[in-house]
Amino acid sequence: MLVYIAGSGAMGCRFGYQISKTNNDVILLDNWEDHINAIKENGLVVTGDVEETVKLPIMKPTEATQEADLIILFTKAMQLPQMLQDIKGIIGKETKVLCLLNGLGHEDVIRQYIPEHNILMGVTVWTAGLEGPGRAHLQGVGALNLQSMDPNNQDAGHQVADLLNKANLNATYDENVVPNIWRKACVNGTMNSTCALLDCTIGELFASEDGLKMVKEIIHEFVIVGQAEGVELNEEEITQYVMDTSVKAAHHYPSMHQDLVQNHRLTEIDFINGAVNTKGEKLGINTPYCRMITELVHAKEAVLNIQ
C-alpha cells in the first residue's frame, strides 16, 4: 500500500517511520521548509528507544501526485481544511483516510472532502517529540483504536488496523470509538488549556485544591454535552481515567503549554474546550468553565500577538 502521512510533525514522523519498516511505501507530507530540507538532505534522524537515520520521501502536500491507498491525518486541527484541500489530487475512489487528530468535530470537516465510506476515525496514546527539523525523538510504547465511520465498510477498518499492527503500532479495531475520542479530548480539556494558562506541569495543577475543583467541573461539562450528543460517557470512569493520566504525566508540560507559553503558537483550543462550548450552545447546555477557558486562551494568544 502507498501510505501518506499528512502532517509530519513528531507523531507523523513516528507513524511514518514505523510503517516504513513494513512492506508498505510511505511518503511524508508537510509545509515546514526546514523540516522538509533536513529530511531530504540527511534522512529522518530517529533518537530515543532506537537510534537510526532513515531515508523517507517528504514533500509539500500540493506536490504529491501518486494516488494514495491510505492517508493518515496528523496535521494541527486548524490546518485540517487546508490540508484536505491540498491533497485532493491524491484521493481516489478507494483511498482510506484515517484521522488521529486530538479534539472533537473533525469528522464534520472530513466529510466535506471524503465520502463516509472511506473515513476512519481513531484515537491514539502514542507520544513523540521533535528535537528540531528532521529529528524525531521516539520513546515509550502506545496504542490506538480506530473505527470505520461507515458501518457497511468495517473491512476497511480491519485492514488498516492490520497494517498498523505490522508496524508495531498496537492498533485495535473498535466497534465504538467515539467515546474513546471524547475521553481523550476530556484529558486534553482538563490538562492542556489549564496548564498553559497557569504555566505549570500537570502534577502541579492536580496538587492544587482549586485546580482539582476546576478539573472536575470541566469533566462534568464534557460528559453532559457528550451524552446529549448520544455518546456513551460515564463521568465516574472518565474522572478516574483523568486522575490516572495525571499521575503518569505529572512531570509533563502538555502540548498546549508548549504551543502557547514556550513557542508562542496558535493553540487547538477551539477543538477541545471550545468545541464543548460550541456544541453546548447548540444543545442549550451551559458550559461556563469551557467557555471561560476558551476565551482566556484566545485572549492570551492576542496578548502574545500570535497569528
UniProtKB/Swiss-Prot annotation:
* Transferase is among the record's keywords: no
UniProt binding sites for substrate: N102, N188, N192, S255
Q: InterPro entries from the xrefs?
A: 6-PGluconate_DH-like_C_sf (IPR008927), 6PGD_dom2 (IPR013328), ApbA (IPR003710), Ketopantoate_reductase (IPR050838), KPA_reductase (IPR013752), KPR_N (IPR013332), NAD(P)-bd_dom_sf (IPR036291)
Q: Which domain of life is it from?
A: Bacteria
What reactions does this protein catalyze? (R)-pantoate + NADP(+) = 2-dehydropantoate + NADPH + H(+)
Q: Which UniProt keywords are present, listed alphabetically?
A: Cytoplasm, NADP, Oxidoreductase, Pantothenate biosynthesis
Coiled-coil segments on the chain, per record: none
Q: What is its main location?
A: cytoplasm
**Biological process GO terms, please?**
pantothenate biosynthetic process
GO CC terms of this entry: cytoplasm
* Pathway annotation from the record: Cofactor biosynthesis; (R)-pantothenate biosynthesis; (R)-pantoate from 3-methyl-2-oxobutanoate: step 2/2
EC no. given is 1.1.1.169
Name its cellular compartments.
Answer: Cytoplasm
- Stated family: Belongs to the ketopantoate reductase family.
Q: What does this protein do?
A: Catalyzes the NADPH-dependent reduction of ketopantoate into pantoic acid.
Which protein, by its recorded name, is this?
A: 2-dehydropantoate 2-reductase
This protein's species is Streptococcus pyogenes serotype M18 (strain MGAS8232)
